[in-house]
Curated annotation (Swiss-Prot):
It comes from Drosophila grimshawi. The chain crosses the membrane at residues 51-71, 78-98, 131-151, 225-245, 254-274, 303-323, 337-357, 397-417, 436-456, 469-489, 511-531, 547-567. It holds the Pfam family SNF. This is Sodium-dependent nutrient amino acid transporter 1. It is a multi-pass membrane protein. NCBIfam families: Na_transp. Residues 1-40 are annotated as: Disordered. The lineage of its organism: Eukaryota, Metazoa, Ecdysozoa, Arthropoda, Hexapoda. Its main location: membrane. The gene is NAAT1. Keywords: Amino-acid transport, Glycoprotein, Ion transport, Membrane, Sodium, Sodium transport, Symport, Transmembrane, Transmembrane helix, Transport.
Length: 636
């Protein structure tokens, strides 16, 4: 995006009105300006709308159109929807708003924000590891999308009709549902009533047999990369590199297109999907609540993970984007807009997919929509193409538009994730941005090769489950604990009040302090205790696969204690115990980056501490009220 360099400004913070606070984060206030002798300048967005559109482009992406439908499909449709909405309000929105605040308040990236609690430095590096895992397989989805985009320009969509070698195949093309291709290559008109084997649509068989050449067993290896998908993967990474090589300076104007164009295609597909026969049954399956599933912890765990993926929480892009805001930018408004629009987009994608699944169930004579197609990451590459093949007018055009849209969404998601990694590296080593972008893009391409093999979908499922799910989940818990429980909600809310000149509502305080961390901890512990061996398409992974998955999780999660130990060991202030306690306190680098804003902030915090100390002494119940305040951040 087009940026302009300027010093950051505070927000009417000379004498802001507000509550009083225990100033436990200013243990180094006497030396607060030692690191700020020179005026710090920070590039800012040229306008707030570009920031908003950029957040929409990363949050409203593959997580909504690709991951949400198959996650809902695997968890019972309406059985998943209710927990997802609850999780959104109790976990998703609070975490999203918190990360926006952290980035804007400090003007720092995912790792350097942990000057707030230095021993939690490993949270930032662990999240970077989880982000790398996500990037590795997201790029393979771009390769699949690019492949489908290329074949969409053929005279006939290649997945719309059955091939001679496909048994029990039903054409996806309209008016040909009952034409089943037999093993001898002859075509016969049959009715599904007497067919003993399960019928499969031509779009599903095309994806499994032609595009990914799926292996049903990886005990002997995953196979060699497919040359067509390898080329598509290479082209995808070239595009990614070209976008990120100049950082955020050139992507602002594109954010308008990246954020708005997908809705045109989505509404077009929705309009066609809801008019198909059986679509109502699919939509009802998606929207009808199944209250009994509220007691299923697996559904809650999947709702949390999907919320993180959809909003890009716990992986760094939100912190990175908001770090380029002016200090007084109204992020509360933007956080509410993005999280609400993200949910509506997920519902839009879900209704579209399940309308198509309802139509497939009708055509394949299947009573249970869960049995229509195999679940998994390929669902979007089966259901959407099947719907497009039913367009009466120029389906090739709609196919090209849809997969171009999916490619754009993928680029928006990966660019944000990849930029997070590049920013972390550049912040640490001060290397040239384009060189880091080039090297990381090459590494991303090499990692992505494993996903374009016949066993690639197995690896994708494994990495998504252990690296993209549990690593992100547990580190998000540590992130919230470090900010809300160790730094303290009261201190955090004081910082927000200083930045926005507004008091923080009880809803946010209660979520950050109680509801969000407790819900996340309970769901995570229960999901770990009741975890079952991972499967792909109802087939269990070999033992080596499970071992590799747990090793992946261990590498990501271990970043937290390892970097914590490193910080304590290298910043000894006495005994190990004293050094550990000191490592839980904010360092001298914590606070606003602009020196003038930082001085005002320190005066603001000091004034609050003095006022609260006076109140505590003058009130017999002051001591207990102060303790209560420190817990929940409410005014005494």
């Amino acid at each position: 995006m087009e940026l302009k360099t300027m010093p950051q400004n505070g927000a009417n913070n000379g004498n802001p009105q507000g509550n009083t606070s225990n100033n436990n984060n200013t243990n180094d206030s006497s030396n607060s300006n030692s690191n700020n002798n020179n005026k710090t300048e920070r590039t800012n967005w040229s306008n707030g709308l570009e920031f908003l559109m950029s957040c929409i482009s990363v949050s409203v992406g593959l997580g909504n159109i690709w991951r949400f439908p198959f996650t809902a499909y695997e968890n019972g449709g309406g059985a998943f929807l209710i927990p997802y909405i609850i999780v959104l309000f109790m976990i998703g929105k609070p975490m999203y708003y918190l990360e926006m605040i952290m980035g804007q308040f400090t003007s720092q990236g995912t790792v350097k924000i942990w000057s707030i609690c230095p021993s939690f430095l490993g949270v930032g590096y662990g999240q970077a590891f989880g982000t790398i895992c996500i990037i590795s397989y997201y790029s393979s989805l771009l390769a699949l999308t690019l492949y489908y985009l290329a074949v969409s320009f053929q005279a006939d969509l290649p997945w719309s009709t059955c091939r001679d070698t496909w048994i029990n195949c039903v054409n996806s093309r309209p008016a040909e549902y009952i034409e089943t291709m037999m093993t001898n290559g002859s075509s016969a008109l049959t009715r599904a009533t007497d067919t003993p084997a399960k019928l499969q649509s031509s779009s599903e068989l095309y994806f499994l047999d032609v595009v990914i050449n799926e292996k049903t067993d990886i005990s002997d290896g995953v196979g060699n990369p497919d040359w067509k998908l390898t080329i598509a993967l290479f082209v995808s990474w070239i595009v990614i590199f070209l976008v990120i090589m100049r950082g955020v300076k050139s992507s602002g104007k594109a954010a308008y297109f990246l954020a708005l164009f997908p809705y045109v295609v989505l509404f077009t597909l929705l309009g066609r999907a809801v008019t198909l026969e059986g679509a109502v049954d699919g939509i009802i399956f998606f929207l009808e609540p199944q209250w009994g599933e509220l007691l299923n912890p697996t559904v809650w765990k999947e709702a949390v993970v999907q919320c993180f993926f959809s909003l890009a929480v716990g992986s760094g892009p939100i912190i990175m984007f908001s770090s380029y805001n002016r200090f007084d930018h109204p992020i509360y408004r933007d956080a509410m807009i993005v999280t609400t629009l993200d949910t509506l987009t997920s519902l839009l994608g879900g209704i579209t997919i399940f309308a198509i699944l309802g139509n497939l169930a009708h055509n394949l004579k299947v009573e249970n929509i869960r049995d229509v197609v195999r679940s998994g990451t390929g669902l979007a590459f089966i259901s959407y193409p099947d719907a497009i093949s039913k367009f009466n007018a120029v389906p090739q055009l709609f196919s090209a538009l849809f997969f171009f849209m999916l490619f754009v969404l993928g680029i928006g998601s990966i660019v944000a994730l990849q930029s997070t990694i590049v920013t972390i590296i550049c912040d640490q080593f001060k290397w040239k941005y384009w060189k880091v972008a080039l090297v990381t893009s090459i590494c991303g391409f090499l990692m992505g090769l494993v996903y374009v093999t016949p066993g690639g979908q197995w690896i994708l499922t494994l990495v998504d489950f252990y690296g993209g799910t549990y690593v992100v989940f547990i580190l998000a818990i540590f992130e919230l604990v470090g900010i809300a429980w160790i730094y303290g909600v009261s201190n955090f809310c004081d910082d927000i009040e200083f930045m926005s000149n507004k008091r923080v509502s009880l809803y946010w305080r209660a979520c950050w302090l109680i509801f969000t961390p407790i819900m996340m901890i309970v769901i995570f512990i229960y999901s770990m205790v009741t975890i079952t061996p991972i499967k792909y398409s109802d087939i269990y992974f070999p033992v080596a696969g499970d071992v590799a998955g747990w090793l992946l999780f261990a590498i990501g999660a271990s970043q937290f204690p390892l970097w914590g130990w490193w910080y304590v060991h290298n910043h000894r202030t006495g005994s190990i115990a004293k050094s550990f306690v000191d490592s839980l306190k904010p360092s001298q680098k914590w606070g606003p980056a602009d020196p003038e804003t930082r001085r005002n902030w320190l005066l603001f915090k000091s004034d609050l501490a003095a006022k609260r100390a006076v109140q505590a002494k003058s009130d017999k119940m002051g001591f207990f009220r102060q303790k209560l305040y420190n817990m929940c951040g409410r005014s005494t």
